[in-house]
């Protein structure tokens, strides 16, 4: 009610200006008529101001609520998006029929360059389905009765899905007969269950961790039963395919020198360092780096341990001789590059199981980390200057 008070003050200040007060004092008879008119006019203005202020407040309260989007509104937005995409493709000289979302993002970044750090604050042009949240259709009729019998559970889609899955489990347990003692195991390699966020997006409902875990347990129980094609298709709705990483490691072939000694060569990289390693099948554990013993080349103990770790992991200490050449980078990066090169060369003298153990231990995986560049206006890559008020 602060706004009406300010407005009332303005009205009263206009009525009691010095000129008005002087005229009223000269003509006392005019005071009565003026007072009646002033009361009537002022009451009207005050009531009007108060009424207007209350209505504005109510409108602001309603505007702050979550907005609901109808199907007609979404269709209109999609039509406008398609028209805008066609215009944007013509501006960029591209074919509108093959103008994908990646092309739209690239065109927007080119036409509207922005230096804002927050990407969500930059200009964008996305499909309405990605901007406006999904909403359910009307869940009750004109008489106010809900359509679904599980409406008052608060999670009708989730409990309806659980009801369907449990019905399939009961039906399969009823008809499997003599197969009750044996549980079928299916190969699910190459796919995964939906995560909780994906399931919530599918059901358009918020789920707890217990609800999600119970749903996954019920689906896993369904998979242990002898399922038909219909059940298999039903379960696949809640699985997503994943890219299978090849477990086969490229192994360098064994070579032989003039004396008939078997050896293997390989390369490794770490940051800007590049290393080549030659690992001999038999030896006494000598390691030379650029013609120098590794104890002299690497004075830091941590770098020496990096070089010895592949042999220590395979229990092959003092069984191989190694000759390495390395260039670029610092001592830590060179040690990492040599370790990767030696681990790859060792694969030629070990079994497939040992190669798999090395892969799982990370010995055959290159380290992609590099030094992060310094940012302008900062002391370093992440560190900021000390803030001073003046």
UniProtKB/Swiss-Prot annotation:
Component of the mitochondrial ribosome small subunit (28S) which comprises a 12S rRNA and about 30 distinct proteins. The keyword NADP does not apply. It comes from the Eukaryota. Residues 368-390 are annotated as: Disordered. This is Small ribosomal subunit protein uS9m. Belongs to the universal ribosomal protein uS9 family. The keyword Zinc-finger does not apply.
């Amino acid at each position: 009610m602060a706004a009406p008070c300010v407005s009332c003050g303005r009205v009263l200040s206009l009525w009691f200006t010095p000129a008005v007060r002087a005229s009223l004092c000269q003509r006392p008879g005019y005071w009565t008529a003026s007072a009646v008119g002033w009361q009537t006019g002022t009451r009207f203005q005050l009531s009007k101001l108060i009424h207007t202020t209350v209505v504005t407040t109510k409108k602001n309260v309603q505007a702050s609520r979550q907005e609901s989007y109808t199907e007609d509104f979404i269709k209109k937005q999609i039509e406008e998006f398609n028209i805008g995409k066609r215009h944007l493709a013509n501006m960029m000289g591209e074919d509108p029929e093959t103008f994908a979302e990646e092309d739209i993002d690239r065109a927007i970044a080119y036409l509207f360059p922005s230096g804002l750090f927050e990407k969500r604050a930059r200009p964008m042009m996305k499909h309405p389905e990605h901007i406006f949240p999904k909403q359910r259709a009307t869940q009750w009729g004109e008489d106010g009765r809900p359509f679904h019998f599980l409406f008052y559970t608060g999670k009708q889609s989730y409990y309806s899905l659980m009801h369907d899955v449990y019905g399939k489990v009961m039906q399969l347990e009823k008809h499997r007969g003599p197969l009750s003692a044996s549980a079928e195991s299916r190969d699910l390699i190459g796919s995964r269950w939906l995560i909780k966020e994906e399931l919530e997006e599918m059901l358009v409902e918020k789920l707890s961790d217990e609800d999600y875990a119970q749903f996954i347990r019920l689906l896993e129980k369904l998979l242990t039963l002898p399922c038909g094609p219909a059940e298999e298709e039903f379960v696949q709705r809640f699985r997503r395919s994943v890219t299978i990483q090849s477990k086969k490691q490229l192994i360098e072939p064994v070579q032989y020198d003039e004396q008939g000694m078997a050896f293997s060569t390989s390369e490794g990289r770490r940051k800007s360092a590049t290393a080549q390693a030659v690992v001999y099948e038999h030896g006494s554990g000598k390691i030379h780096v650029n013609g120098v013993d590794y104890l002299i080349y690497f004075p830091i103990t941590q770098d020496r341990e990096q070089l010895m770790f592949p042999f220590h992991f395979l229990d092959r200490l003092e069984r191989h001789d190694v000759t390495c050449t390395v260039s670029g980078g610092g001592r830590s990066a060179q040690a990492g590059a040599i370790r990767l090169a030696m681990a790859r060369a060792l694969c030629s003298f070990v079994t497939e199981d040992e190669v798999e153990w090395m892969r799982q231990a990370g010995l055959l995986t290159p380290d992609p980390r590099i030094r992060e560049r310094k940012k302008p206006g900062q002391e370093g890559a992440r560190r900021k200057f000390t803030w001073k008020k003046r």
